[in-house]
């Protein structure tokens, strides 16, 4: 039996089109969600009306109304620090939980490991890529990521399986320092690296979040800026020589692959 309590936090900015599906997928979870904390970052669309509706209808839904636009990292950080549960899970307002047993499966793993070792871990599931309308783009077969999670996360070896929207111990967020608030790219990966200093990541074995691909996302950011950001992040952490060599090989390989792809699309 699982004894850990769970909160889910959602940063929102002008997601009127998607916010209902996001909130409904959280409220439909088979595992009880103690708190659903939404940070609204000064939205100017109808999402504020929707959030008021949900906060009035559901006693576990709490909305933090931002006084000024602060960006997603600060929004997440503020929402996380407002939670009081044992574990916290994050979900962006334009995404949704693909499976209504997502949190239950993750917490079963967390409880099992805690009962065996007395240690709290981060538990994640695999994502499914969907387009703006919610149609599935890719539904990759779940892979066994139950081995050396540290190596895979540090080196970004499997970018399609990079842990996101996972359940993590609330106390470890404070201990690791949380989000770096002025980081514009790869802030989630940096948080992964921080949490890795304290505990292990464990794969639940199933699907979790439907990740919505929209114009203006990371894929639209200059590849050189992406590479430089990843290098600046990894240099903050103590990692092994093997991890460092593999990271640079994979990072530069991805950069060159994208540059060649762009060259071919423009000139060939």
Residue ranges with predicted function:
Residues 101-137:
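Conserved donor NDP-sugar-binding/catalytic core segment of glycosyltransferases
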Residues 4-7, 35, 190:
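Cell-envelope/extracellular polymer assembly enzymes that use nucleotide-activated donors
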């Amino acid at each position: 039996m699982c004894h850990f309590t769970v909160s889910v936090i959602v940063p929102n900015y002008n997601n009127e089109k998607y916010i209902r599906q996001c909130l409904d997928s959280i409220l439909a979870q088979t595992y009880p969600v103690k708190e659903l904390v939404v940070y609204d970052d000064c939205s100017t669309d109808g999402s504020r009306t929707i959030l008021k509706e949900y906060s009035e209808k559901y006693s576990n839904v709490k909305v933090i109304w931002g006084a000024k636009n602060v960006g997603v990292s600060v929004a997440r950080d503020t929402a996380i620090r407002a939670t009081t549960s044992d574990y916290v899970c994050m979900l962006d307002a334009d995404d949704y939980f693909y499976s209504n047993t997502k949190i239950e499966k993750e917490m079963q793993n967390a409880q099992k490991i805690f009962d065996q070792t007395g240690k709290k871990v981060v538990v994640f599931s695999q994502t499914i890529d969907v387009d703006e309308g919610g149609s599935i783009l890719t539904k990759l077969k779940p892979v066994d990521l139950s081995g050396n999670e540290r190596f895979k996360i540090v080196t970004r070896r499997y970018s399609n399986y990079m842990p996101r929207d996972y359940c993590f111990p609330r106390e470890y967020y404070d201990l690791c320092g949380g989000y770096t608030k002025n980081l514009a790219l790869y802030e989630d990966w940096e948080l992964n690296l921080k949490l890795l200093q304290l505990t292990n990541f464990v794969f639940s074995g199933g699907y979790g979040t439907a990740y919505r691909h929209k114009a203006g996302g990371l894929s639209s950011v200059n590849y050189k800026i992406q590479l430089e950001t990843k290098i600046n992040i990894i240099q903050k952490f103590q990692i092994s020589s093997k991890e460092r060599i593999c990271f640079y090989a994979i990072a530069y390989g991805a950069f060159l692959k994208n540059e060649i792809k762009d060259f071919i699309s423009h000139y060939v």
